[in-house]
Amino acid sequence: MYQVKGYFSSLKGSYYEIGKQQGEFVKQHSYLIPQFIEQENLISHNHWTESRNILNQYCYGVNEEIEGFCEGLKIPAKNMMYYYQTLLKAGCSHCVVLPKKTDSKHTYVLRNYDLSPVIDDMRFCSTHVEGAYAHSGFSTQYFGRTEGVNEHGLSVTFSACGQPVGNIAGLRKPMVIGLQCFAVIRLLLEKCKNVQEAKLLIEEIPIASNINLIIADPLNAAYIEIFDGHKSTITIDDEKQAFIVSTNHAVSSSIQKLNNRKLEQSTKRYYLLHEHLNRCEQVSIESLKKLVEEEYPAGLT
């Protein structure tokens, strides 16, 4: 059987201190080092400076965390791949079900994240950084988050909206200057208590990723599509609509005008999940787990 090793991390202290903690961990597991360091001089001085500046403006503390990480490993911060992959210049499924439609009367959030373990951190991380809300979720490039829930019960999940955007081969070139999704998600988890605060912050920050975000707090949820810098937001509450579904294509009319391409499997996964939630009067955790445990086309995996 193919086995993959994962990790649990509990990070506490200042940004710089938790950076040093992570650097010490990687030092003890030296085979992890290559995934953080660029070896081909991909990062120009200007790109590195711009990346640091935008992180300092919108994601305060992450630069300090990276400095602590680099201090522990005795490597230059300029060589960190995070700076190259975070600033972007121009087969996931997820949903939220609000209390009215769940068997426990609590909000349920589901996400199926299809990424190769070869390029994934494989790390579920509980982060308690000074001056930010504590949160737990999966990390990417150690400093980013692919999803999570914070101490106030705010959860954030995402899927690509069409072809993923990035600075590496095979990804769509960004059309605007802005942040990658994993920087945005961590920012939302650390700075926002509820859906309303998250919506306001998303309107402020430059985002280059083409993504579908589902943001939920204990009573409300929002679905946000972002494509080439354009943003469309739909908000629901427990009185009007009980769930939101997203896969890898746009459903809002404004974003569909910009990108109406749909992969067949994305459409099928969307309707599979939507019909399951529509059919169930009361959704259970067990029924959601069954969907993500079954392989496509019967399930979401």
Predicted regions and their residues:
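Asparagine-centered polar/low-complexity signal
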Residues: 112, 150, 212, 243-248
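Loop-centered beta-sheet repeat module
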Residues: 167-222
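Extended amphipathic alpha-helical segments with heptad-repeat/coiled-coil character used for oligomerization
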Residues: 220-241
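A contiguous strand-loop segment
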Residues: 3-5, 21, 32, 36-39, ...
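A broadly conserved detector of short glycine/acidic/proline-rich loop/turn motifs that flank catalytic sites
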Residues: 113, 160, 219, 228, ...
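C-terminus-biased signal that marks the final domain/tail of proteins
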Residues: 1-94, 190-203, 218-220, 243-301
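Ordered hydrophobic segments in well-structured contexts
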Residues: 96, 108, 212-214, 221-225, ...
